[in-house]
């Protein structure tokens, strides 16, 4: 049974008022927070103009706003075990953040300027897209990753994950009982801690065969490793999924192999469309075409 008290408690909502009347309203507000909301709404308007029926999915993937997402589509994604692609996650932050960082370096900025600018922009992006626990986990780990590059240090995922968890729990310890927090960090544990052990075991088993592997064998091995990595993440998060949702998609392992490689195309085309729409709507129409084709498929 859904524990609404624990769910809202994690969001610092402890009381519910019914049929309340507002007698006085504060006029104070965060000007910068309102600015980020206005920017998000501007981008959402551009996507609604240019993406047609796929606008809701684009807004969820690019802006983290599921308000206009078709409930039936959301249910299909959830039943298929791929609902996570509609949330701002580590995959989204990595694709956008590292893409931005590499782009800034290519246009002539050094490691320090490119890294600092990418850090600032991605932090604002995380705040603009709602600042959910999974988003802030991804942003924290991205900040640590780029910070390590700037400082000339080596970044490792388990340390970054632990630091992100500490920072988030310091802000709100109740997140330790939140499903989103546990699933987000459970996925990172799967790919960053469990998967390397499985991979090491596979390498030991295949060490004798490596000299005899041909090109087809290499492709087969890559597909097998991708499938195993997806399976490891699914199995790592399985207890959490069953505890909070009571059901699991067996097909999710296979569908993730097909869906995850295309997320970058949808995210990239949606982001390009939103940015181009500030200058030219026609350019935005063209930019979102690849993403629309994938979402329709």
Protein language model regions, located:
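Short amphipathic alpha-helical coupling elements at transmembrane boundaries
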Residues: 45, 60, 75, 105, ...
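Hydrophobic alpha-helical transmembrane segments in multi-pass membrane proteins
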Residues: 17, 70-253, 281
């Amino acid at each position: 049974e859904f524990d609404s008290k624990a769910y809202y408690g994690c969001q610092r909502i402890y009381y519910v008022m019914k049929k309340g009347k507002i007698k006085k309203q504060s006029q104070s507000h965060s000007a910068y927070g309102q600015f980020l909301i206005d920017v998000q709404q501007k981008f959402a308007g551009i996507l609604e103009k240019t993406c047609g029926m796929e606008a809701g999915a684009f807004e969820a993937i690019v802006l983290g706003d599921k308000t206009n997402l078709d409930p039936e589509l959301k249910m299909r994604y959830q039943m298929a075990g791929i609902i996570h692609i509609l949330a701002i996650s580590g995959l989204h932050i990595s694709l956008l953040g590292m893409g931005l960082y590499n782009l800034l370096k290519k246009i002539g900025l050094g490691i320090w300027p490119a890294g600092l600018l990418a850090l600032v922009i991605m932090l604002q992006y995380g705040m603009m897209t709602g600042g959910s626990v999974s988003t802030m986990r991804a942003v924290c780990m991205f900040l640590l990753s780029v910070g390590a590059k700037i400082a000339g240090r080596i970044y490792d995922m388990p340390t970054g994950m632990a630091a992100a968890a500490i920072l988030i729990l310091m802000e709100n310890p109740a997140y330790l009982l939140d499903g989103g927090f546990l699933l987000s960090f459970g996925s990172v544990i799967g790919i960053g801690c469990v998967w390397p052990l499985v991979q090491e075991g596979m390498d030991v088993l295949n060490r004798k065969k490596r000299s005899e592997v041909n090109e087809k064998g290499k492709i087969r091995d890559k597909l097998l490793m991708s499938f195993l990595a997806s399976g490891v993440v699914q199995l790592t998060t399985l207890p959490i999924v069953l505890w909070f949702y009571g059901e699991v998609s067996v097909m999710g392992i296979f569908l993730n192999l097909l869906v995850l490689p295309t997320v970058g195309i949808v995210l990239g085309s949606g982001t390009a469309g939103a940015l181009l729409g500030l200058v030219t709507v026609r350019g935005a129409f063209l930019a979102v075409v690849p993403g629309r084709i994938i979402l329709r498929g």
